[in-house]
């Protein structure tokens, strides 16, 4: 039985977690990593992996996934494998405010594995949104937004910006003699960047992942 791209990515995640942490991910962690709405989708893919002989599951254990067949041999004696270009493993770097700017927190909290097709352009990392000032763009509190790292942006693009060591996501507006960061929620006021402020574009918004809540 052939595996889908998602199932291959799940198998890679299982092997990686066993290698790095010594234990496989739980079904809940797999669902969260791939943005599934619930664990039933994770169960479906795990059943397919088991039927294909790639894993076996120990009944009654929350982390009862075991590698089997070729996957187990590959872990014991890893072979050189081509890098897949359709799957991304992205670090989650703290939080970004979609509201008032909050202090930057760039420590890597977690990694998420997902298909590249969710984003354009390709992101370099994810940030967790706090606040609802970008609500009318469909960006909500708790979303994970993809960020393409760049210092260049055009007026009208949604950017992740740094203002005096604080990070925020807003709509960039560049005027003749001023720069403003606009919310997409009428309950919030625009942020005008003052000449004496330390301001920089950290990246472009390029899509989002909505974790199951």
UniProtKB/Swiss-Prot annotation:
Name of this protein: LexA repressor 2
UniProt cross-references to InterPro entries, sorted A to Z: LexA, LexA-like, LexA/Signal_pep-like_sf, LexA_DNA-bd_dom, LexA_repressor, Peptidase_S24_LexA, Peptidase_S24_S26A/B/C, WH-like_DNA-bd_sf
Organism: Xanthomonas campestris pv. campestris (strain ATCC 33913 / DSM 3586 / NCPPB 528 / LMG 568 / P 25)
UniProt-listed HAMAP family: LexA
UniProt GO molecular function: DNA-binding transcription repressor activity; sequence-specific DNA binding; serine-type endopeptidase activity
Subunit structure: Homodimer.
Keyword DNA repair: yes
The protein's role, per its UniProt record: Represses a number of genes involved in the response to DNA damage (SOS response), including recA and lexA. In the presence of single-stranded DNA, RecA interacts with LexA causing an autocatalytic cleavage which disrupts the DNA-binding part of LexA, leading to derepression of the SOS regulon and eventually DNA repair.
GO cellular component terms attached to this protein's record: protein-DNA complex
Start-end of DNA-binding region: 27-47
Annotated site, Cleavage, chain positions: 98-99
Keywords, ordered alphabetically: Autocatalytic cleavage, DNA damage, DNA repair, DNA replication, DNA-binding, Hydrolase, Repressor, SOS response, Transcription, Transcription regulation
Enzyme Commission number(s) from the entry: 3.4.21.88
GO biological process terms on file: DNA repair; DNA replication; negative regulation of DNA-templated transcription; proteolysis; SOS response
Active-site residue numbers: 133 (for autocatalytic cleavage activity), 170 (for autocatalytic cleavage activity)
Record field: catalytic activity: Hydrolysis of Ala-|-Gly bond in repressor LexA
Family affiliation: Belongs to the peptidase S24 family.
């Amino acid at each position: 039985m052939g595996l889908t791209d998602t199932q291959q990515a799940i198998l890679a995640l299982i092997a990686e977690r066993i290698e790095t942490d010594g234990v496989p991910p739980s079904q809940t962690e797999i669902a969260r990593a791939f943005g599934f709405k619930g664990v039933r989708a994770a169960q479906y893919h795990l059943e397919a992996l088991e039927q294909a002989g790639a894993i076996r599951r120990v009944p009654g254990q929350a982390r009862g996934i075991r590698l089997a067949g070729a996957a187990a041999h590959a872990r014991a004696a890893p072979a050189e494998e081509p890098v897949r270009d359709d799957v991304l493993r992205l670090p989650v770097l703290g939080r970004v405010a979609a509201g008032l700017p909050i202090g930057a927190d760039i420590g890597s909290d977690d990694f998420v594995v997902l298909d590249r097709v969710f984003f354009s352009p390709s992101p370099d990392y994810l940030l967790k949104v706090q606040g609802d000032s970008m609500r009318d763009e469909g960006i909500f509190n708790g979303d994970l937004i993809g960020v393409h790292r760049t210092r260049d942006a055009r007026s009208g693009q949604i950017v992740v910006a740094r203002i005096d060591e604080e990070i925020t996501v807003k709509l960039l507006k560049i005027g003749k003699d001023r720069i403003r960061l606009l919310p997409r929620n009428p309950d919030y006021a625009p942020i005008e960047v003052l000449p004496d402020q330390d301001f920089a574009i950290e990246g472009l918004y390029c899509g989002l992942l909505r974790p199951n809540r």
